[in-house]
Amino acid sequence: MLQFSTGNPRVLTNYVTLNFGKDTIMSILKKLAGETLSYGFSTILGRSLNFLLVFVHTWAFLPAELGVNVKLYGYVAIANIIYTYGMETAYFRFAKEAPEKYYQLIMTAIIVTSGFFTLFLFLFAEPIMVQLGYPGKGLFLNWLALILAIDAITAIPFAKLRLENKIKTFVKAKIVSILINVGLNLFFLMLLKPLQAGEIQIDAPQFLRDLYNPGIGAGYIFLANLIANASLFYWLSAEFKAYRWRWDWSEFKALWIYAYPIMFMSLAAMFNLMFDRLLLESYLPEGFYPGKSSQVALGIYGNCYKLSVFMSLAIQAFKYSAEPFFLGKKTTENSKENLALITHWFVIVCTFLWVGVSCNLFWIKTLFLRRAIYWEG
């Protein structure tokens, strides 16, 4: 039997007693840690490769050019929640009763709603971009709408893999998609861009020089993301072949009642994370940073913010294993005690990561932020 103090030195008798044996504790921690490391492998490798793109993007573009990416990806993070509207978590909750039925039902709902959302964004892409302050960039929103649709439609097959503990398939699909994204970024920005500008003197076919359109610029980051996401349909083909159209209003109503509070809570949490990037450009007083426009400030801030990837890696890996671990269980024996114990150690690990990153920023910035103009962020 283990006891944990609440941490208040003035109340020595306030303990949380965990009424299960040491072997049970160790088996829980071992299982969750093992799954976290398995999912963490793909997450850490993938995010690390994606993090290297900060090096590429800050080398290829000035802060003002990257401002549109920072802002639009902030909206994408919020739109992702709207596109899935809590159904990923609802799947973990209901699939333990009838896996195939709820997989097909939720997939049907996600496909239909993603189609409507994406059609809306396509129809109003240009007016929306004008309101955001980026006229003539409607193509960017078209690409992002497709990215959002693919993300939403593939979210449930990925959840199915996690619930069935098919870690290898999950990891393979994630890593290959990320490798394609990284490869295309390198191709567009470190080969085609300098080749078109005449910065690379090599004997290359003319069509390669014509592939890069300077008018698109940082939009190639969106295009690379779209192509990489589209590749997921191939790697998840088995899960899509298992899908059959299914609809039942009464069943969907039960799913929706469970899912919509999760959606609103997720929206609140995500807006809390993203509102700075969404509002900075509009509300930053002109001339607040001497010699820099608000768009330049947004580009600097948004790319420096990506240094937090070291923390987000651990959190995302933990989330991938924790959701099916807790929500996929049919019994709730000792669930409160298990959650308390796991949260206790999760906070400890995250604290050490935060301290480690904070103490090493002086060399991390020079390694990943290739232009000195970004360092002041």
Q: What would you call each of these model-derived segments?
A:
Residues M1-F51, Y103-Q104, W249-M265, K336, ...:
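N-terminal membrane topogenesis motif
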Residues N19-L32, Q196-A218, A224, S231-L273, ...:
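Interhelical loop/hinge segments that connect adjacent transmembrane helices in multipass membrane
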Residues I28-E88, T113-A125, I147, V182, ...:
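Signature of the first transmembrane helix
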Residues G34-G46, L72, A77, I81-E126, ...:
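Membrane-water interface segments that mark the loop-to-transmembrane alpha-helix transition
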Residues W59-L66, E164-K172, I178-S231, G291-S294:
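Membrane-interface helix-loop junctions in multi-pass transport and translocation proteins
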Residues F94-A109, I300-G377:
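Specific pore-lining/lateral-gate transmembrane helices of multi-pass inner-membrane transport
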